[in-house]
């Protein structure tokens, strides 16, 4: 399983995950990335989302219709910047991931997990076994 010490984070990774920051839209690694695989928490390495639930939302950040395992996600009320939103954090590392909104695809449950690329790491399907995520291969065989 991939893990990263907080001291190894880049400036933007630290600002996003530890200071509840947000990276710029359309200028981040995964906003337009649709390869087959799994997205894991940048710090703990815990699997959070798969490419099967990723969709193009035109918001400029990676968007997913659901989490791989709801137990790996914490949702908190966020009243920052004069808005009322639902913050999404990683359960294992308590890192800020992004926000969840109720404007996602209706046929997939209506949610849009809007996630910062700086908070996640993509594991290609072909490398799942090699990197310790082999148990997730069956998720793609449905």
Curated annotation (Swiss-Prot):
The keyword Oxidoreductase applies. Pfam families: SelR (PF01641). It catalyses: L-methionyl-[protein] + [thioredoxin]-disulfide + H2O = L-methionyl-(R)-S-oxide-[protein] + [thioredoxin]-dithiol. GO terms for cellular component: cytoplasm. The active site is at 114 (nucleophile). GO terms for biological process: protein repair; response to oxidative stress. The keyword Oxidoreductase applies. GO terms for molecular function: peptide-methionine (R)-S-oxide reductase activity. Residues 2-125 form the MsrB domain. Its EC number is 1.8.4.12. Keywords: Oxidoreductase. Belongs to the MsrB Met sulfoxide reductase family. This is Peptide methionine sulfoxide reductase MsrB. The gene is msrB.
